[in-house]
């Protein structure tokens, strides 16, 4: 009798369990589609390069909010601080991986990204960096892509632009660059090679490194004594701001020409923007553009963060929108694994055309390098103005 009772009770419990299970509906394709893709990146949110990291994070968040508001593809964004340090970048990346990151915005600056790109390659997480421009970032890694130009392209394009605009036809050129920075070195090397080909005379070629990046009196004196009338600065904002200030104090007033790393110098805390008057640079983004989409982005960024967005911000904004386009075209859903998404993103980015703030008709080759046009800019009255 006890056995019968036990059997009956067991049957009742089994039926209750089955009823409970059947009351919970199975996930539907619609449920998967309405969930969010986890997208993350590492950036210098503190420290000397924070101007770039925060610009990228802020603009990426604007893009995520806009895309999420439209329905369809949804994103959950997370950034971790790497302080522009490769070792800290690895720790930041691992935090994002543990969080469940499915697609990546890579790292903002080149040195950290050269390290984290190796991790995303090994883990088969697709990465699209807005601003890590060194060739080593993507070299030998089929799932690492760039929204920015590579360093070699910036160097040769700068020399060609200077020649085409007649900026160095009758003047001598100086270069001040950072010899322990892959970004600065990569641009310098192709700039110098292009100058040799184009017949541009470099009369002063001086360098600096970490730990020796606050006093530029020797470099400035060398350029000044050799009669350089145009100084090329393939460096970031922090050293550029000091060079401009110290040159002015020394009474040295050449023309200055920089690249995308100097975009943002006007928003540096404590920097006298009058020192940057007349500075020229190449960048894919013009915040002064009357283009409707650009103007709307600039206004929204200013309203939210109180400053004009730089090229790093625009590239990050484009990254998120490019991801949205690629994910939608691939029919991807957030329940897919990072590896499966990686395969689909490689297929999409090597075949699609993308229009964004930093260019129209953008395409990527199999090495992850983007094709788009650079724009000449000059700083006038504390604002960026297009030269072209």
Language-model segments: residues:
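C-terminal motif of bacterial Sec signal peptides marking the signal peptidase cleavage site
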Residues: 16-20
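Positively charged n-region of N-terminal signal peptides that target proteins for export
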Residues: 1-9
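Extracytosolic ligand-binding ectodomains
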Residues: 22-388
């Amino acid at each position: 009798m006890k056995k019968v009772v036990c059997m009956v009770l067991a049957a009742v419990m089994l039926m209750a369990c089955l009823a409970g299970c059947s009351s919970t509906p199975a996930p539907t394709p619609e449920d998967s589609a309405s969930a969010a893709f986890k997208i993350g990146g590492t950036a210098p949110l503190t420290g000397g390069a924070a101007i770039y990291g925060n610009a990228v994070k802020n603009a990426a968040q604007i893009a995520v909010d806009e895309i999420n508001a439209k329905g369809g593809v949804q994103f959950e964004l997370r950034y971790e601080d790497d302080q522009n340090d490769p070792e800290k970048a690895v720790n930041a990346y691992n935090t994002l991986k543990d969080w469940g990151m499915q697609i990546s915005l890579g790292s903002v600056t080149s040195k950290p990204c050269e390290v984290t790109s190796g991790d995303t390659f090994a883990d088969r997480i697709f990465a699209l960096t807005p601003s890590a421009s060194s060739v080593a970032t993507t070299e030998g890694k089929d799932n690492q892509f760039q929204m920015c130009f590579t360093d070699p392209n910036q160097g040769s394009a700068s020399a060609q632009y200077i020649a085409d605009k007649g900026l160095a036809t009758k003047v001598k050129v100086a270069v001040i660059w950072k010899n322990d920075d892959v970004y600065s070195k990569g641009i310098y090397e192709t700039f110098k090679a292009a100058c040799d080909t184009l017949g541009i005379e470099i009369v002063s070629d001086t360098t600096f490194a970490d730990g020796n990046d606050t006093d530029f009196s020797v470099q400035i004196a060398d350029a000044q004594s050799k009669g350089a009338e145009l100084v090329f600065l393939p460096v970031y904002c922090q050293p550029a701001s000091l060079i401009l200030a110290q040159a002015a104090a020394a009474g040295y007033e050449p023309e200055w020409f920089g690249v995308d790393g100097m975009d943002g110098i006007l928003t540096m805390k404590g920097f006298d923007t009058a020192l940057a008057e007349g500075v020229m640079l190449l960048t894919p983004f013009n915040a002064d553009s009357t283009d409707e989409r650009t103007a709307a982005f600039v206004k929204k960024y200013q309203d939210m963060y109180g400053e004009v967005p730089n090229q790093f911000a625009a590239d990050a904004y484009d990254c998120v929108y490019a991801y949205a386009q690629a994910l939608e075209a691939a029919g991807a859903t957030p329940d897919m694994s990072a590896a499966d998404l990686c395969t689909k993103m490689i297929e999409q980015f090597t075949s699609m055309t993308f229009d964004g703030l930093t260019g129209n008709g953008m395409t990527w080759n199999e090495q992850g390098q983007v094709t788009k046009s650079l724009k000449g800019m000059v700083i006038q009255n504390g604002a960026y103005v297009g030269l072209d």
